[in-house]
């Protein structure tokens, strides 16, 4: 069970002869839309599935034209534009207890962390479907604390500001990191590194210090 990367990262509960509960090191909070507008529109949709039960009730099973007309009509709502920010934390120490039982192999490795970072910064863009059309990853902010640090960072949801107006020259979203930069300055003795991965085609970053490593998402 613990050889599976998703279990090592997000945890699991296994009920069998012996009950095992793994509290995952990775915890992700609900997303908060930090864009100024929340314009939601709705549109009418029809179900692509045949309504066989209705056909039988009306004894029209042998009439294909009637069957094709039996559709379910509903509505779906969509957000015109939103920028959702999810705070998350990674605490490898969550696996200490279970590793004492089954061995060191269940601890998170550097390779595991790299796979997590790739998934977080590209997963939404890769997951393309009708319901997810138009959704793309925009940014990943990664703050690594020094070995042995017991510091608990606050949610970044209130420390990263998306300006109300896009850049007038190129229409890019402007993210202001002033509040987060000030917070990290206060705790810099506990911080090992700060990395920001962002989509350079859609974003502009402000008030990041030169110590912050910036990469294309």
Where do the PLM segments sit?
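Basic polyanion-binding and macromolecular-assembly surfaces
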Residues: 1-217
């Amino acid at each position: 069970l613990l050889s599976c990367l998703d279990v090592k990262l997000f945890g699991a509960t296994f009920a069998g002869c012996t009950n095992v509960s793994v509290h995952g090191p990775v915890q992700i909070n609900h997303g908060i839309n930090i864009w100024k507008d929340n314009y939601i529109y709705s549109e009418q949709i029809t179900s692509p599935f045949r309504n066989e039960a209705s056909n039988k009730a009306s004894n029209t099973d042998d009439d294909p034209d009637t069957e094709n007309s039996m559709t379910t009509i509903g509505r779906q709502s969509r957000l015109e534009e939103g920028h959702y920010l999810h705070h998350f934390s990674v605490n490898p120490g969550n696996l200490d207890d279970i590793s004492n039982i089954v061995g060191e192999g269940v601890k998170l490795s550097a390779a595991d962390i790299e796979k997590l970072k790739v998934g977080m910064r590209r997963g939404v863009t890769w997951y393309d479907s009708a319901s997810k059309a138009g959704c793309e990853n925009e940014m990943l902010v990664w703050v690594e604390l020094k070995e042995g640090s017991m510091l608990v960072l606050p949610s970044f949801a209130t420390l990263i500001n998306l300006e109300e107006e896009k850049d007038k020259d190129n229409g890019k979203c402007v993210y202001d990191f002033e509040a987060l930069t000030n917070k990290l300055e206060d705790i810099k003795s506990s911080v090992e590194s700060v990395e920001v991965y962002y989509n350079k085609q859609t974003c502009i970053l402000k008030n990041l210090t030169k110590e912050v490593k910036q990469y294309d998402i």
